[in-house]
Amino acid sequence: LVNNPDKYDFSEIKTFVQNIGGVQKEYESKMDRVDLDPLQLIEDEEKFGNVKFNIKRLQDATHGVGGGNFVVIFARPEAGKSAFWISLVANKNGFAEQGKKCHAFINEEPAKKTYVRLISCWTGIVRDLIKERIDEVRKEWNLIKNNVFVYDSVDISMDDLNNYCEENEVDIIIIDQLDKINIRGSYNAQHEKLKEIYKQARELAKRNNVLVIGISQASAEAHNQQRVDFNWLDNSKTGKAGEADLIIGIGKPRDSDKDYDRWLYLSKNKLTGEHIDIECSLNHTLSRIE
């Protein structure tokens, strides 16, 4: 070997060594070291909750949310899931008025119906009066409409959403309903697939530095209950809940004689650790929760 090195072919060894270097580089590219001055860390955390909730007690309990967060809102059918996120987006002091680009992907009710509900929520004008007050509606809606994007998206996948974020200006993504989003792969059980959907929703938030809000159903145990916690997420005892930063259950109490009584319960709150019940009311005609 020493006397006649040209006789030997070291190409495979060279390739092996180069590949080791490539693996190390790929490994490092997946990590982002945190090494900042303590003051800088605190100031960055204070900036983090730059998306404010327009329900005071909810804002106080969370200090707001921001890019990289994954929030789950869930309830029984007809309890006000869509009305809640519509109110967070389009009610006064909501996400849209704060200047956040809100993109809603609808795979349950027709998206045109959702859009009308957003308009009513913002303007305070019920659907049946929109035509006769159209000039007023247009003037008011123009104030926030460039921050509200609504899509009919029955067959959309998580890959589609990642691509969408890369190509558009996005602050907030709302997925109504998250459980119906398509993902790659085959799964032995429904709960395994749902866990992966929620895992990918969290990754969608972190990878694109956006706030992701997923809307989901509550299981039958939550029917007529005031306090709805994450143990009642439909078809998942742990997998869904494990991925979220904040989980808000909407309760509709059995003993209430008022159809508009609602309770919000923060059964998971990694933002501040505060778990509270919030009494509120649902305005069906304006899709507002206040």
Residue ranges and their predicted role:
Residues 180, 189-224, 242-243:
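Conserved P-loop NTPase motor cores
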Residues 71, 103-105, 151, 213, ...:
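Hydrophobic/aromatic beta-strand patches that form the interior of the parallel beta-sheet core
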Residues 1, 96-188, 196:
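Conserved inter-motif catalytic segment of the P-loop NTP-binding fold
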Residues 59, 74, 89-90, 103, ...:
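Generic hydrophobic alpha-helical scaffold/packing signal
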Residues 158-173, 203-208, 220-290:
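C-terminal regions of RecA-like/P-loop NTPase motor modules
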Residues 25-124:
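The Walker A/P-loop phosphate-binding site
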Residues 1-36:
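Short, small/acidic-rich helices and loops at N termini and domain boundaries
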Residues 106-109, 177, 210, 214-219, ...:
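A short beta-strand-to-loop transition that corresponds to the Sensor-1 phosphate-sensing loop
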